A protein has these predicted regions:
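Short amphipathic alpha-helical segments
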Residues: 98-105, 159-167
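Non-catalytic accessory regions of SAM-dependent methyltransferases
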Residues: 16-145
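Non-catalytic substrate-recognition/targeting regions of SAM-dependent transferases
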Residues: 129-136, 140-142, 163-232
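Short, surface-exposed beta-strand-loop junctions and turns on beta-sheet-rich folds
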Residues: 82, 159-160, 227-228
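Active-site beta-strand-loop-beta-strand hairpin of nuclease catalytic cores
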Residues: 148-151
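Short hydrophobic alpha-helical segments enriched in small aliphatic residues
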Residues: 6, 10-11
Length: 232
């Protein structure tokens, strides 16, 4: 997991700068898990959420998280419809949540797994982005077939869903693969208050079936659904 804590500030924060953002205030005594690096914030830990009503209702709105004494704790993606009310983007008061951050996180994830991609056969599925592990909560990306193949993305939280365009741009730039497909888990998306969508985000859709080799065993895989059957 990235070092979210670099540059953490607890006092003297310029709150005037953030007057257009949501402010999540954590109940007294409930900030311990955040101080220890826990990236999920549940409703039971939140004292109040201040900000514009439309931002409160929009899944993935960026919020400042503060303690009951108004000390900065984190920046997070807020979702009033989710059991996990907020997912931390960064514990660093100096790190803005913007296109540059998203692209930087995607690049770091791809660079981390570059060796695995190089070793993989063309008919192997490679995990390229692993959600919280890469500082991109709720984002899963698998690659198949290299630059001429397909990237399959799952946006399982409001924060990454709100940054979908920037994420796809960064994935294409980092892999050279222009075929990007979104596959969703209906139960997860529904629980996050997100629309149920499947389809190409860039380039072509995958075929109904591709050949997958895993641990020496061959499967027929539908990249669009994730379903596989033993190859005969």
């Amino acid at each position: 997991m990235p070092d979210y804590h670099q540059g953490r500030h607890h006092a003297g924060f310029n709150w005037i700068y953030w007057n257009n953002m949501l402010i999540i205030t954590i109940k007294q005594g409930k900030e311990k898990s955040l101080l220890e690096g826990q990236p999920w914030i549940y409703a039971s830990a939140i004292e109040k959420v201040d900000g514009k009503p439309q931002e409160k209702m929009k899944p993935g709105s960026t919020a400042i998280v503060q303690s009951s004494s108004q000390q900065f704790l984190a920046r997070a993606a807020y979702n009033s419809k989710s059991q996990i009310r907020a997912r931390v983007w960064s514990f660093d008061a100096n790190e803005a949540v913007d296109h540059a951050m998203i692209k930087r996180r995607v690049k770091l994830a791809l660079d981390k797994r570059a060796a695995a991609v190089t070793r993989a056969w063309r008919n192997q599925l490679v995990a390229l982005v692993k959600a919280e592990e890469d500082g991109l909560p709720g984002l899963l990306v698998d690659g198949y077939g290299g630059a001429e193949g397909y990237l399959v993305c799952q946006f399982q939280a409001g924060g990454v869903d709100a940054w979908k365009v920037a994420i796809v741009q960064a994935l294409i730039a980092g892999t050279g693969c222009r075929n990007v497909y979104e596959r969703c888990d209906p139960l997860i998306r529904k629980g996050e208050g997100l629309p149920i969508v499947n389809g190409a985000l860039s380039g072509d859709e995958p075929p109904d079936e591709v050949l997958l080799t895993e641990n020496g065993v061959r499967f027929a895989l539908d990249l669009k659904t994730g379903e596989r059957s033993k190859f005969r």
